[in-house]
């Protein structure tokens, strides 16, 4: 593996290797003080973000520092991109400065694969358009594996805006590769055409979807969808598809809940469901576990691509 531009095409053995490596790093993050071998000392990683980010950018920066690497943070607004510089020129100039790897977030689908085609340095996709977000899917896989002890045979339901979600796409690929069953639940306007051909079940009612699933991954609803004709209103979407305690209580069994963030509270997920980390109740929020696992997964990816 020379780059990580997506999970598509990666064998199960590679995903398991990354998850196993991340598990070791997660154990290290639980120790006080955190101490890790400086495997990437004297390496410099360019964090090239053309879109805003909190969790992904900071966790990559922490991951790099834990392994002894330095980081260079790039934002489009404060760079020569604001003066018209192209993506390819930006990458070539950073490469000429002898950076060792690129972590790229970009609004255009396929941007990471394009950058990988013009540089000899490893490229890690931190989210490109509606294409993929591979490290988010890996941290979700790690979170599910920690909770259940396995991935194979699980029934995972992805709830929300499937049509525009790179997180959904990478999760579907990763979960299927490791043997999980997958369902999606959304209004038909937020489902890709012919999604059933991906080998996933399709639900348009949340109660039936929850009854089927072992765990739920809730996606952020981009608020502009309410004015774009995809949903009647935020209120109606929340009433039909928002994950609430009342809907989960009808299951009478515990349901682990994941969300990639940022959260639209009381729209796609209620405060109670987002914040509950243990019973009483029938939901178990895994959101903070996901955040911690994000650092561990990104350490594993940097290790795999850069450690010699």
Swiss-Prot record:
Catalyzes the condensation of carbamoyl phosphate and aspartate to form carbamoyl aspartate and inorganic phosphate, the committed step in the de novo pyrimidine nucleotide biosynthesis pathway. Carbamoyl phosphate binds at residues 55-56, 105, 133, 136, 261-262. Its EC number is 2.1.3.2. Heterododecamer (2C3:3R2) of six catalytic PyrB chains organized as two trimers (C3), and six regulatory PyrI chains organized as three dimers (R2). It comes from Chlorobaculum tepidum (strain ATCC 49652 / DSM 12025 / NBRC 103806 / TLS). GO terms for biological process: 'de novo' pyrimidine nucleobase biosynthetic process; 'de novo' UMP biosynthetic process; amino acid metabolic process. Belongs to the aspartate/ornithine carbamoyltransferase superfamily. ATCase family. It is an enzyme of class 2 (transferase). GO terms for molecular function: amino acid binding; aspartate carbamoyltransferase activity. Pfam families: OTCace (PF00185), OTCace_N (PF02729). PROSITE patterns: CARBAMOYLTRANSFERASE. It catalyses: carbamoyl phosphate + L-aspartate = N-carbamoyl-L-aspartate + phosphate + H(+). Keywords: Pyrimidine biosynthesis, Transferase. The keyword Transmembrane does not apply. It comes from the Bacteria. GO terms for cellular component: cytosol. The keyword Transferase applies. This is Aspartate carbamoyltransferase catalytic subunit. L-aspartate binds at residues 83, 166, 220. Pathway: Pyrimidine metabolism; UMP biosynthesis via de novo pathway; (S)-dihydroorotate from bicarbonate: step 2/3. InterPro entries: Asp/Orn_carbamoyltranf_P-bd (IPR006132), Asp/Orn_carbamoylTrfase (IPR006130), Asp/Orn_carbamoylTrfase_sf (IPR036901), Asp_carbamoyltransf (IPR002082), Asp_carbamoyltransf_Asp/Orn-bd (IPR006131). NCBIfam families: asp_carb_tr, PRK00856.1.
